[in-house]
Amino acid sequence: MATITAADVNKLRTITGAGMMDCKKALVESDGDFDLAIENLRKKGQKVAANRSDRESTEGAAIAVVNADNTVGVVITLNCETDFVGMNENFVKMAVEMANLALNFNNKEEFLASDFNGITIADKLIEQTGVIGEKLEIRTFEKLEGAFVGSYIHSGNKIATLTAFSAKADGIEEAARNVAMQAAAMNPIALNEEGVDADTIAKEIEIAKDMLRAEGKPEAMIENIAKGKLGRFFKDNTLVNQDYIKDSSMSVANYVKSIDANLIVTGFKRAALG
C-alpha cells in the first residue's frame, strides 16, 4: 500500500478543492493514484448532486465582468443553497473565474460545455457540489456588447449589471458604472418604451381602466385616459426614462447626454439572486 503524505493530501486538495479528510480518504482508497482519487471525488459529487437536484439554490454570487477594451461584458449567477457558502471567499473566487471564462462564449450551453482546469464547467459544478455539499448551478448567463460596456456588482454579490453605450467618451467609465448602478437599484423592465412587450403594455392599460372605472370616470373617456397613463409607467420602468438616482431633476438619458451630447445607452443586463 502506498504511503500517503500530508503533501499528497494538500496537492489533491489544491486540485479539487475538497476537504482534507475527503482527500486523504480518496488517496487511501486509490492507493495513492491521483487520477483515480480525483475520479472518485467526482463520482461522490455526482451522487451528492443527484440527491440534491430538487433543492432550492437561491443564494450564491452574481458577477459581472468586461473584457480588456470594454466592448464585451458577461453577467452570471453561480447559485448555491445557503448564504454561508455564497459569501465564502473561495466560492466567490470560483464565480469570478467562471465569469471571466464566460466572456469567450455566446450562451450558457456553450459555456457549460467549456473547459475549466481540465473538466467542463458542468462537471466542475457537480464536483464542487460533492465538495461543498450544496446544489450548485449557473442560473443566469447574459452577454452584452457595445462601443463601451461597463459593469457594477452590488455589495455582497447579490446583484450584478452591465450597461452598453453608443460610443466611448470622456468620463464614460464613471457614467457606465453610474447607469449600471441605476439598473441594479431600480430594476427596470426594459431599456426604453420600444423594449416593453405588448402583453405588458396591454396589462397596464387594463389595470388603469379598472382604476378609472372605480373612480367613476365616463366609459367614453377611459380608453384615452388609460393610454395616457402609460407615460408614467414607462418613466418608472424603463432605464433611460427613469429619474437618475443621483440627481432626480434629470432622467438617465439626460444624465448620459450631460457626459456627451451624442452619447446614448444601447443596452443593459441585470442578474439578481433569488
From Swiss-Prot:
An annotated Gene Ontology molecular function: translation elongation factor activity
Coiled coil: none
Keywords assigned by UniProt, alphabetized: Cytoplasm, Elongation factor, Protein biosynthesis
InterPro entries in UniProt: EF-Ts_dimer_sf, Transl_elong_EFTs/EF1B, Transl_elong_EFTs/EF1B_dimer, Transl_elong_Ts_CS, UBA-like_sf
PROSITE patterns from the UniProt entry: EF_TS_1
A GO CC annotation given for this chain: cytoplasm
Subcellular location per the Swiss-Prot or TrEMBL entry: Cytoplasm
Domain of life: Bacteria
Residue numbers spanned by region Involved in Mg(2+) ion dislocation from EF-Tu: 82-85
One Pfam family matching this protein: EF_TS
Classification via CDD domains: UBA_EF-Ts
Function: Associates with the EF-Tu.GDP complex and induces the exchange of GDP to GTP. It remains bound to the aminoacyl-tRNA.EF-Tu.GTP complex up to the GTP hydrolysis stage on the ribosome.
Family: Belongs to the EF-Ts family.
Name of the protein in question: Elongation factor Ts
Native source organism of the sequence: Flavobacterium psychrophilum (strain ATCC 49511 / DSM 21280 / CIP 103535 / JIP02/86)
Gene of this entry: tsf
